[in-house]
């Protein structure tokens, strides 16, 4: 089902991309947009994980430098019945994390330096389990495709500001000043709405499955509360420069959108915590626990 959802998303985003191209350049613009969209679809499927990791300056963690952290992730992956993902570190003080990759065999989990410093090992395990749930559900390709297309659509809409008011080679005037302004506002908004719909619907499921993987819903609940509070106060510069990837993080990393419920990329954190607390109250815990170091060498 993951590939089916991704295929539908690619079709929707491609149609939106073509529409923007047609409004900017008429028939020629639509043809160019179609070619660009086809290339983007290929690139996104095979290389979008590398692109997103590069956007955030993530570097792969050497198992010898953080053996306990690697052992924790490997143990959680085994409990989830999936391959060990590649592990990346993002050098920012804001605690956060995301997962990416086209399938469980080609996946990566990225955590921030701030996450490893601010959270307890149990809370880190809860966060990693949440990201593994996204990988297991094949949400990662879906979210990465959305981020890539949303960024491209926003960029294309900005081109309309410079080229949308004139005539194209066929003498057509696809959009005037009013149309250009509408395009600049509505195209990124439409892409953003797709992002929000996908992210909100998948976060609750990843919370539920992540809690089952780590065996302790309250570990993740505690982590979410702590990340939410710190993320409001600590900047994530690379995330602010790449807002199209905000929906990939476990908590929205953007300050501008953190208080906007209408355009939130994530469900309300208090509601997520309440759902996890309800799971714990219902006894949804595992008797066997993952190996969690008392004090990781990454701090």
UniProtKB/Swiss-Prot annotation:
UniProt cofactor note: Binds 1 zinc ion per subunit.
Keyword Cell inner membrane: yes
Keywords in alphabetical order: Cell inner membrane, Cell membrane, Hydrolase, Membrane, Metal-binding, Metalloprotease, Protease, Transmembrane, Transmembrane helix, Zinc
CDD domains: M48B_HtpX_like
Residue pairs linked by disulfide bridges in the UniProt entry: none
InterPro entries: HtpX_protease, Pept_M48_protease_HtpX, Peptidase_M48
Gene Ontology MF annotations: metalloendopeptidase activity; zinc ion binding
TM regions (residue ranges): 7-24, 29-46, 145-165, 174-194
Protein family per UniProt: Belongs to the peptidase M48B family.
Protein name, entry field: Protease HtpX homolog
